[in-house]
């Protein structure tokens, strides 16, 4: 789902169709073959550059995983890992990317953390951590606006269900996992501030 499961308590998170963890490589290859994306003599049907968020080794490994699984269906992925300022400029200023591994903070309400990644009004060249995919859907925009102002909890949940259905169908972003940050604490540990 495009909304974090953290919104489950508010009734805004919907369980959307989930795709198998292992995937069906034969079916994926057939879909691409049928769409006219034939493999060449080296088994490559297309090439893509994949920009990785430069926040450490976990993100590099995530990119290597995507490179491996897409390679199984003939998509040759080149990984690009740059320093933070270069990555920010490439993704949010120049829109100079094909695919991008990133994550979203959804914060305490979808208006704060979801709208900025999908609303047409959030296509703001040079502004970090907004709609860098430049996804635009007038129907979704109307629903985002309705979700922002609807005071009735049940009606608001219905609006966000429709939002999640549109995003599941259009897939401007492929959500691979839900990231949870850990907090480790011990009363014996003092003076960290």
PLM-predicted stretches and their roles:
Residues 1-17, 58-68, 85-193:
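Detector for C-terminal structural segments
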């Amino acid at each position: 789902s495009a909304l974090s499961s953290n919104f489950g308590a508010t009734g805004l998170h919907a369980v959307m169709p989930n795709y198998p963890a292992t995937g069906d490589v034969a079916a994926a290859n057939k879909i691409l073959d049928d769409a006219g994306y034939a493999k060449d003599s080296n088994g490559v049907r297309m090439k893509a550059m994949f920009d990785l968020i430069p926040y450490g080794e976990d993100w590099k490994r995530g990119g290597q995983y995507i490179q491996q699984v897409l390679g199984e269906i003939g998509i040759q992925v080149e990984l690009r890992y740059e320093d933070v300022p270069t990555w920010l400029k490439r993704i949010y200023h120049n829109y100079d990317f094909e695919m991008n591994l990133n994550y979203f903070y959804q914060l305490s309400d979808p208006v704060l953390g979801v709208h900025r990644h999908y609303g047409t009004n959030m296509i703001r060249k040079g502004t970090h951590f907004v709609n860098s995919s430049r996804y635009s859907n007038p129907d979704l925009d109307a629903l985002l606006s309705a979700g922002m102002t609807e005071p009735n909890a049940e009606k608001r949940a219905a609006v966000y269900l429709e939002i999640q259905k549109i995003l599941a169908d259009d897939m401007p972003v492929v959500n691979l996992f839900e990231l949870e940050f850990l907090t480790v604490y011990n009363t014996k540990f003092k003076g960290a501030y």
